[in-house]
A protein has these predicted regions:
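ATP/NTP phosphate-donor binding region
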Residues: 1-89
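A glycine/threonine-rich phosphate-anchoring loop and its flanking beta-alpha core
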Residues: 11, 107-147
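Short amphipathic alpha-helical surface micro-motifs
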Residues: 16-19, 43-45, 96, 114, ...
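Fold-independent oxyanion-binding glycine-rich loops
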Residues: 17-18, 38-40, 93-95, 116-119, ...
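Short glycine/serine/threonine-rich phosphate/pyrophosphate-binding segments
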Residues: 20, 43-47, 72, 97-104, ...
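Short, surface-exposed, polar/charged, turn-prone segments marking secondary-structure boundaries
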Residues: 41-42, 62-66, 90-92, 118-121, ...
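Short, glycine/charged-enriched secondary-structure capping and boundary segments
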Residues: 49-52, 78, 105-108, 128-131
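A short, small-residue-rich loop immediately preceding and capping a beta-strand
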Residues: 82-119
Length: 147
C-alpha cells in the first residue's frame, strides 16, 4: 500500500538575527491595522523591535496582553477588539496559547495571521489547529483550520 505524507507550511517564513526589525517590511502586504495578541513575556521580548520596524509608517498597531489561556471568552474578547477598531491583521506573539488565540481570532474574523513564536518548544506555529478551552480552563475543543 502506498503511504502518502503531507506537510503544511506557512506561506512565508522569516528567520534570522534581529528579524523582528524587518517585521513591517516583510509583512506590509497583509494590511495596515494590526492587532498583536501577546503573552506578557512575548510583549517584553518583541514590542520594541516590532515598533522600530514600523517607524515612518502610518500603520495602526494595537497590543493586547491576553489572559494566558486560549479560551472561548478570550477569543471573543479579541474578536471584539478587531471589529471595534477595524483591524485587518492579527499577530500572535508568545507561546502556544497566545498563538492559538491569534489563529482562532484571525480564522473567525477571516483575516490573515502572523505568528511570532517566542518559546522554542511550542508547536503552535506549525499546526493547523488551535486548542480551545472553556473560561474555567477545562478543555473545550480543537479548532481545525481548512488551510
Amino acid at each position: 500500500m502506498l503511504r502518502l505524507r503531507m506537510m503544511r507550511a506557512p506561506q512565508k517564513y522569516v528567520q534570522g538575527k534581529d528579524s523582528l526589525l524587518q517585521f513591517h517590511k516583510e509583512m506590509t502586504s497583509l494590511g495596515d491595522k494590526w492587532l498583536f495578541i501577546c503573552s506578557r513575556s512575548g510583549y517584553k521580548m518583541a514590542h520594541d523591535k516590532i515598533e522600530k520596524s514600523f517607524e515612518g509608517t502610518s500603520d495602526v498597531r494595537q497590543y493586547e496582553i491576553f489572559g494566558g489561556v486560549s479560551s472561548t471568552g478570550e477569543i471573543e474578547k479579541m474578536r471584539e477588539i478587531v471589529r471595534e477598531n477595524h483591524l485587518n491583521v492579527v499577530v500572535g506573539v508568545g507561546g502556544g496559547s497566545a498563538i492559538d488565540t491569534a489563529k482562532a481570532t484571525a480564522h473567525y474574523e477571516k483575516l490573515p495571521v502572523v505568528i511570532v513564536p517566542t518559546v522554542v518548544a511550542t508547536d503552535a506555529p506549525c499546526t493547523g489547529l488551535s486548542v480551545i478551552y472553556n473560561d474555567d480552563e477545562t478543555f473545550n475543543s480543537y479548532l481545525f483550520y481548512p488551510k
